[in-house]
Amino acid sequence: MDQLAHHYRAHIAELNRRVAEILSREALSGLVIHSGQPHRMFLDDINYPFKANPHFKAWLPVLDNPNCWLVVNGRDKPQLIFYRPVDFWHKVSDVPDMFWTEYFDIKLLTKADKVAEFLPTDIANWAYLGEHLDVAEVLGFTSRNPDAVMSYLHYHRTTKTEYELECMRRANQIAVQGHLAAKNAFYNGASEFEIQQHYLSAVGQSENEVPYGNIIALNQNAAILHYTALEHQSPAKRLSFLIDAGASYFGYASDITRTYAFEKNRFDELITAMNKAQLELIDMMRPGVRYPDLHLATHAKVAQMLLDFDLATGDVQGLVDQGITSAFFPHGLGHMLGLQVHDVGGFSHDERGTHIAAPEAHPFLRCTRILAPNQVLTMEPGLYIIDTLLNELKQDNRGQQINWQTVDELRPFGGIRIEDNVIVHQDRNENMTRKLGLTD
């Protein structure tokens, strides 16, 4: 924690610098950032799990307490309005006493609807950042999530501070332990549901605390890109295992994927080839490289695998140009990572939020930025047997280039995805996932 505390001072200074700059540009007095409010389930007295506003948790690791507020202007000590109601039904959050508290003027709020008493008196010239625009209107904010402010903050959130990088290393370190436990459970015969329990126990986080719903897919379920069903019964024959799962640390996410074959076979060889390709793609990451170019390079590598493993005939460029590789690899190579799993800023060309769209032939690519130091991205190439996409190839001449017998042989295995979390440095890449122990 000492290292985090050391980095945190510079982190807060950088956030204050960003706020001061955008306030000056937009002639605003300051920002009031709302952690959020509970959401009640329809016709029920139970709330959905609370998720804090990412703009709020960028400043401090208060992740589970709604009705909190930050008042910041880039000059004065930030004010934290911390919610501590009188409540005998629920656990009330303790008054914070961690290393970060010295950087905030902390006020305690006992009734959520009394927050106006703590807010600036000239509220009309302050901007509200948060989800609950109705609350902001009642409080008198005329500027609510202004585009110029949001675009500026989102653009700069892609450049991580040393504090943020350290949090993300720790999120990776935690997730690696979960992945190792899940791998062991798979080879010992566990069901998807049981593997999930092994993972959560190893990372020490609940389903609501991990940054996204884990994908725990055995056999053909691995062909479903966002599979979250968790079957309780083990399959009669165990073939493959795809796990896409992360962990959280102080509000920052890791997002890691591995694929395993139960036995040594052709599918296992395909995993080895994909692992080699993924590491080669990571070696291509450096400041100044366009992320879409890495995505296109991935399609070339997938095309070569289709040829090498007798899944298709033709040549590499032809398979890419005809969209055949997109039927086997339909998603993007990766995305920005940080406070959110699919972090903001991936399409931002500049501080004004100028949008750089994904290439028309690759609409699911989530990042079009030019790589720069201190960005963190996922690298997650894949190859799947997805019948709905492959059936489209059958409808035209492209289907003649597919070896359907090989497709049929691989279909029960579902698919492959391998994903690491990588920091781009000025002179090197830091593959946090591999460095912290998940080497295969």
Curated annotation (Swiss-Prot):
Mn(2+) 2 binds at residues 244, 255, 419. It catalyses: Xaa-L-Pro dipeptide + H2O = an L-alpha-amino acid + L-proline. Binds 2 manganese ions per subunit. Its cofactor is Mn(2+). GO terms for molecular function: aminopeptidase activity; metal ion binding; metalloexopeptidase activity; phosphoric triester hydrolase activity; proline dipeptidase activity. Its EC number is 3.4.13.9. It is an enzyme of class 3 (hydrolase). The keyword Protease applies. GO terms for biological process: proteolysis. Mn(2+) 1 binds at residues 255, 335, 380, 419. One of its GO terms (cellular component) is cytosol. Keywords: Dipeptidase, Hydrolase, Manganese, Metal-binding, Metalloprotease, Protease. Splits dipeptides with a prolyl residue in the C-terminal position. NCBIfam families: PRK13607.1. Belongs to the peptidase M24B family. Bacterial-type prolidase subfamily. This is Xaa-Pro dipeptidase. It comes from Shewanella baltica (strain OS155 / ATCC BAA-1091). The gene is pepQ.
